[in-house]
A protein has these predicted regions:
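Gram-negative/organellar outer-membrane beta-barrel architecture
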Residues: 1-78, 82, 161-163, 171-179
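C-terminal outer-membrane beta-barrel translocator/porin domains of Gram-negative envelope proteins
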Residues: 78-182
Length: 183
């Protein structure tokens, strides 16, 4: 997977207390690139496991309120390695009518790999799809992302995206941990 983002963004700082303070709303320019490679082996029907590695580069510039970074570097390079476990019984991957999707990733970003910030990330996603009538699907999702150690501002958990919690500006709520549930 390759992800690239270069766009003006908004930054409120780190943590809930900064995010709810509208006076913290400030502009900056964000450049982010991620390369993520995983190699999954099928263990049994619908169950996969395998290693993963990723490289992340995040650069923020022209911060209107740089003090909200709390002395963190504006540029972060991060290499992580870990494992992924996936159970996927969905009937159709891009438009499921029934089934389950469970994904657990554990990534480690130690300092001996050249990372300025040493931390680990546990990412768990569980989705359920159930057809309740023709054209009617009940879908639910639980997602949690937990960072332990010292994650940089650009790799913290973000509430709000084009996939989940769409009513929130992406990155307004930025912290080490995240739990979100949606139907």
């Amino acid at each position: 997977n390759f992800y690239f983002y270069s766009f003006p963004s908004l930054f409120w700082g780190i943590g809930y207390n900064n995010a709810v303070n509208n006076a913290n709303k400030s502009k900056y320019n964000r450049f982010q690139a991620q390369i993520k490679v995983d190699f999954l082996l099928k263990l049994v029907k619908n169950l996969y496991v395998g290693p993963l590695v990723s490289f992340d580069y995040v650069h923020g510039k022209d911060f209107k309120k740089p003090e909200l970074l709390e002395n963190m570097a504006k540029t972060t390079r991060n290499i992580s390695a870990g494992m992924a476990l996936i159970y996927d019984s969905r009937d159709f991957l891009t438009n499921a009518y029934r089934g389950y999707y469970l994904k657990l990733e554990q990534r480690f970003s130690p300092s001996f790999m050249g990372n300025k910030y040493a931390f680990s990330t546990t990412d768990l996603r569980a989705s359920y799809y159930h057809k309740i009538w023709k054209g009617g699907i009940l879908a639910g999702e639980f997602h949690t992302l937990i960072n332990t150690g010292d994650p940089p501002w650009g790799l913290m958990a973000l509430l709000g995206s084009s996939y989940a919690m769409r009513g929130y500006y992406e990155g307004r709520y930025r912290d080490k941990d995240l739990i979100e549930i949606q139907l």
